[in-house]
Design a protein with these regions (language model features):
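Short hydrophobic beta-strand element within catalytic cores of glycosyltransferases
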Residues: 135-138, 148
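Conserved donor-binding/catalytic core segment of Leloir-type glycosyltransferases
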Residues: 37-54, 60-64
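Nucleotide-activated donor-binding/catalytic signature segment of Leloir-type glycosyltransferases, i.e.
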Residues: 81-101
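A short, well-ordered alpha-helix in the C-terminal region of glycosyltransferases
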Residues: 182-196, 208
Length: 218
């Protein structure tokens, strides 16, 4: 509307809730994601492009403060070499690209999905993780708060604090890991939220827009 375009509407993004689902959690996949850190208690995961704008380095203080946690980075990109240096001497496993059911299983097998980027309008990977029943932590900025209900289906951290959200991200991670029952509740709520964003809901919304447009022009 600011550009002079009238009669606009926002069509929600769809996520495949049939392929991304909690029952794909497996010990075999957890072993793959843990790699040589298989004796570690908790599995933190990130899925996506390894690029500077994703601000993945913000996860390092979490590993420094939670010795029992391992990070699996699923994906690849131009920032991988730099990240390997940043995460040197931490329990971080660079997995590379995964796809199909293997990717869906990776989401479902993680304990927490970390999405530190503060520049996202809406992260599809967040919805995929939630569809797989993985509690998520994302930035309290952009479109992320539209899908993360803080303390219910995941947690929000504040990336604009003086420490760039370091303590906020650490606290959110510890909060989820500290309470198994709370974590299981978040997992179920995450799945419920994702179901509101599935392709069936997105299609119904689009059909509604078409019907309203045709009705107004009749």
């Amino acid at each position: 509307e600011d550009k002079g375009i009238q009669r606009t509407a926002l069509w929600q993004r769809g996520v495949d809730t049939k392929n991304f689902r909690p029952d794909l959690r497996s010990e075999k996949m957890r072993e793959k994601l843990f790699g040589k850190y298989k004796d570690t208690e908790s599995l933190l995961i990130y899925v996506g492009r390894l690029s500077a704008e994703k601000q993945i380095e913000r996860i390092k203080p979490v590993l420094d403060n939670i010795p029992g946690a391992c990070l699996a980075l699923v994906g690849d990109g131009p920032y991988r070499g730099q990240l390997e240096k940043i995460f040197e001497n931490t329990k971080t496993n660079f997995i590379g690209y995964l796809s199909g059911e293997e990717l869906a299983s990776a989401y479902a097998s993680g304990d927490i999905f970390l999405f530190p980027s503060s520049t996202e309008t809406l992260g599809l990977v967040l919805l995929e993780a939630m569809a797989a029943g993985c509690p998520v932590i994302g930035a309290n900025k952009g479109g992320i708060p539209d899908i993360i209900n803080d303390g219910v289906n995941g947690c929000l951290y504040d990336p604009d604090e003086k420490d760039k959200g370091e303590q906020s991200l650490i606290a959110a991670t510890k909060k989820i890991l500290a309470d198994k029952n709370k974590k299981e509740m978040m997992s179920k709520e995450a799945r419920k939220e994702a179901e509101q964003w599935d392709w069936n809901q997105a299609t119904l919304q689009l059909k509604k827009y078409y019907s309203e447009t045709l009705g107004n022009n009749a």
